[in-house]
């Protein structure tokens, strides 16, 4: 392979390294800004459970190092979540030069909407699901059982719920992409509504902890988001995409001829 052939690859690798470093720096900077408030952040996240615990019950730490490492771990996860827009922008900046004009027009709204939907999903979990789920679980504890949740186990539980609801709220973005690529159409999706409803409960069962309450609270919003995605996908059907591709291809060929 000649030097001329390897030059583009080296350029791309250098650009990729730059974008990865920017992502790492963003996470580290946010983490350093938040680490001082690590205990406050954990208290904020644990508040929905503490409010539902019986009087006199508290959270416990079954590991010697848990009181120190668990809030730090949570703070790092929060830093990753808050830096998501920066990470997505770096991904966009890396792939943008290789995209057609019509693809660039679609990517920016998708990046913005996917970030917003992810945060909305997490907020829905915190403000709606957590109080209902923890209240239900605490009230159904057998008589004589002292409810004292381990702080590390609680973190794993709530992060699983946060991720499940954040990812599930991306359903409209996924549907728009599928219709834009021509893989499916709004008409086909409307015909499959019964299967989607069943699938939403199956996904809720797989993504959430093993209690029917959390599964239902995830499945119902997922189906509603499916309907929202079907509504907006009619503006991004494959025919329009094909026309845009043809126009961009013609523009590229004209530039090449010149």
Curated annotation (Swiss-Prot):
Q: Does the keyword ATP-binding apply?
A: no
Q: Which domain of life does this protein belong to?
A: Bacteria
Alphabetically, the GO molecular function entries are:
identical protein binding; protein transmembrane transporter activity; proton motive force dependent protein transmembrane transporter activity
GO BP terms = intracellular protein transmembrane transport; protein transport by the Tat complex; response to radiation
Q: Does the keyword Protein transport apply?
A: yes
InterPro entries in alphabetical order: Sec-indep_translocase_CS (IPR019820), TatC (IPR002033)
Q: What is the effect of changing residue 94 to A?
A: Export of TorA restored
Quick one: effect of changing residue 17 to A? No anaerobic growth and no TorA export
Q: Which residues lie on this side of the membrane: Periplasmic?
A: 45-75, 137-156, 211
UniProt topology in membrane: Multi-pass membrane protein
Sequence intervals crossing the membrane: 24-44, 76-96, 116-136, 157-177, 193-210, 212-232
The stretches that face the Cytoplasmic side, renumbered to this chain, are 2-23, 97-115, 178-192, 233-258
**Main location, first listed in the record:** membrane
Disulfide pairings? none
Question: Upon deletion of the gene, what happens?
Answer: Disruption blocks the export of at least five twin-arginine-containing precursor proteins that are predicted to bind redox cofactors, and hence fold prior to translocation. Disruption does not affect the Sec pathway.
Q: Which UniProt keywords apply?
A: Cell inner membrane, Cell membrane, Membrane, Protein transport, Translocation, Transmembrane, Transmembrane helix, Transport
Q: What induces it?
A: Constitutively expressed.
Task: Give one Pfam family, short name only.
Answer: TatC
Provide the protein's localization.
Cell inner membrane
Q: Which GO terms describe its cellular component?
A: membrane; plasma membrane; TAT protein transport complex
Q: Which PANTHER family match?
A: SEC-INDEPENDENT PROTEIN TRANSLOCASE PROTEIN TATC (PTHR30371), SEC-INDEPENDENT PROTEIN TRANSLOCASE PROTEIN TATC, CHLOROPLASTIC-RELATED (PTHR30371:SF0)
To which protein family does this belong?
Belongs to the TatC family.
Q: What does this protein do?
A: Part of the twin-arginine translocation (Tat) system that transports large folded proteins containing a characteristic twin-arginine motif in their signal peptide across membranes. Together with TatB, TatC is part of a receptor directly interacting with Tat signal peptides.
This protein's assembly is summarised as: The Tat system comprises two distinct complexes: a TatABC complex, containing multiple copies of TatA, TatB and TatC subunits, and a separate TatA complex, containing only TatA subunits. Substrates initially bind to the TatABC complex, which probably triggers association of the separate TatA complex to form the active translocon. TatC can form a distinct, stable, multimeric complex independent of TatA and TatB. Each of TatA, TatB and TatC are able to interact in pairs without the third partner. Interacts with the signal sequence of DmsA and DmsD.
Q: What is this protein called?
A: Sec-independent protein translocase protein TatC
Tell me what organism the protein belongs to. Escherichia coli (strain K12)
**Lineage, highest ranks first:** Bacteria, Pseudomonadati, Pseudomonadota, Gammaproteobacteria, Enterobacterales
């Amino acid at each position: 392979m000649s030097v001329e052939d390897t030059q583009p690859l080296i350029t791309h690798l250098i650009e990729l390294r730059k974008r990865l470093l920017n992502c790492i720096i963003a996470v580290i900077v946010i983490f350093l800004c938040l680490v001082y408030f690590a205990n406050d952040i954990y208290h904020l996240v644990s508040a929905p459970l503490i409010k539902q615990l019986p009087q006199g019950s508290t959270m416990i730490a079954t590991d010697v190092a848990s009181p120190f490492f668990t809030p730090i771990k949570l703070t790092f996860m929060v830093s990753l979540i808050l830096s998501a827009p920066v990470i997505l922008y770096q991904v966009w900046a890396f792939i943008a030069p290789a995209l057609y004009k019509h693809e660039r027009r679609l990517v920016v709204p998708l990046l913005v909407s996917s970030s917003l939907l992810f945060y909305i999903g997490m907020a829905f979990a915190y403000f709606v699901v957590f109080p209902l789920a923890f209240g239900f679980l605490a009230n159904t504890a057998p008589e004589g059982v002292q409810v004292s949740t381990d702080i590390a186990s609680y973190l794993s539980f709530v992060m699983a719920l946060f991720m499940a609801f954040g990812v599930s709220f991306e359903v409209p973005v996924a549907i728009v992409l599928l219709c834009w690529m021509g893989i499916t159409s709004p008409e086909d999706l409307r015909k499959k509504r019964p299967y989607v409803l069943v699938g939403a409960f199956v996904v809720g069962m797989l993504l959430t902890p093993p209690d029917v309450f959390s599964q239902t609270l995830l499945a119902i919003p997922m189906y509603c988001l499916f309907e929202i995605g079907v509504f907006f996908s009619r503006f991004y059907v494959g025919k329009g995409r094909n026309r845009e591709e043809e126009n961009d291809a013609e523009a590229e060929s004209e530039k090449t001829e010149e």
